[in-house]
Amino acid sequence: MIQGTTSDAGKSTLVAGLCRLARRTGARVAPFKPQNMALNSAVTANGGEIGRAQALQALAAGIEAHTDLNPVLLKPTGDRGAQVIIHGTARANLDARAYHDYKPTAMRAVLESYGRLRGAYDAVIVEGAGSPAEINLREGDIANMGFAEAVDCPVVLVADIDRGGVFAHLVGTLACLSDSERARVRGFVINRFRGDPALLEPGLRWLEARTGKPVLGVLPYLHGLTLDAEDMLPASARTSAARRDAGVLRIVVPALPRISNHTDFDALRAHPRVDFTYWKRGPVPDADLLILPGSKNVLADLAWLRDAGWDALIKRHLRYGGKVIGICGGMQMLGRTLADPHGVEGAAGATSAGLGLLDYATTLTPEKTLVNAAGRLAFGGDARVAGYEIHMGRTEGPALASPALMLAGRGGERPDGAVSADGQILATYLHGLFDTPHACAALLEWAGLDGAEALDYPALREASLERLADTFAEHLDLDRVFAAFA
């Protein structure tokens, strides 16, 4: 089991790289995260929902993503509550106290999934969540040492040296563990190191002498990886185009407080002719294309957009000929009204005017749509698209008569989304809209980028997984790492 001294220490990436290395040996290996809290999720082939990081790890392992890889997924709906997803299905919205009482039920689901994986694969590489040293979360823990103790799982502890204080993080984490938990830790991995490794040697010797545990590797800081993020927005809010000789498209996406599935924009951030910005505060940069992203709380995020002046900004942008895309929750915001009669996102009966840019209305419903989908753009040369839908809502209205996409359905094609009569606004429920090379190029051309190249994002992601595995093979003591899991 890979545990970390902090969130974002590198657990997900380490598991992905180890899965790819194990796959190279011919072993059948599965990633596993007992409990994940994230707003980036993926749809499995069996119609469930798991954390996006586990879908990436499944890709690294060469297996199909399924709900046993992440049996408990928590999707925050606000500062104190989350939607609880068990074995891929949404069960309830619970606040922190209610979820604490629910943990025994969640743990049973975790152990069921882990047992099935152990029986089906040669090895299971487990990822913890956050830090095992959160004293206030120790009782009833199912994500870190509570799980490791329950199944007698050895642990490797990873820490991020780029943040500073790596030795304090490692020694301090061990100090917060019980005797049996400390004994379970087989060694350390230090992540994101920059500079001369020889200068780190005195610290490594001190750490090993102080703790009696080996350092299993020091991983360098890897720039330019194209891998799906588990949850956090990228540290850099802006990426600049690598090529400017043939023109550049400027894209701005508001960093909504409850933004979900922002992996939708990874292909755009990697495109050599796109200037991409996540807007968080201050003046909004000039843009050719504004994209409203998915949201786990559409009504609250729409109110936030209005408070930030985006309703007027979008209308001004359109008057000057700009383009707008709304994806999932962003699509719902673009319509006339939003209603929450069942209290899916908050108080039952809440309603709000939408931005009023497309003639349809959305009603939030307790039933969640979870489906992988493929089809074509309904304009611009019928470029193929592939992605997934994750939403709790039904949208109806005249604007849907001019769909954005035609997706494969039972007995033929089904329409999705809408394109405005003037061709300036596109709305869709499909996540992953830009991941398919020719669809990405067609959409960038629609937004104003002449001669847009087709960027093969899946190939970039695959190359990053290979680079990750090569780096781990060079910088980890793999014999000791895999011996720790024996």
Curated annotation (Swiss-Prot):
Keyword Zinc in record: no
Protein name in UniProt: Cobyric acid synthase
Family: Belongs to the CobB/CobQ family. CobQ subfamily.
Pathway: Cofactor biosynthesis; adenosylcobalamin biosynthesis
HAMAP family, per the entry: CobQ (MF_00028)
Domain GATase cobBQ-type residues, every copy: 248-439
Active-site residues from the entry: 328, 431
Its job: Catalyzes amidations at positions B, D, E, and G on adenosylcobyrinic A,C-diamide. NH(2) groups are provided by glutamine, and one molecule of ATP is hydrogenolyzed for each amidation.
CDD domains per the UniProt record, alphabetical: CobQ_N, GATase1_CobQ
Pfam family, one: CbiA
GO molecular function: ABC-type vitamin B12 transporter activity; catalytic activity
A biological process term (GO) from this entry: cobalamin biosynthetic process
Keyword terms of this UniProt record: Cobalamin biosynthesis, Glutamine amidotransferase
Gene responsible for this protein: cobQ
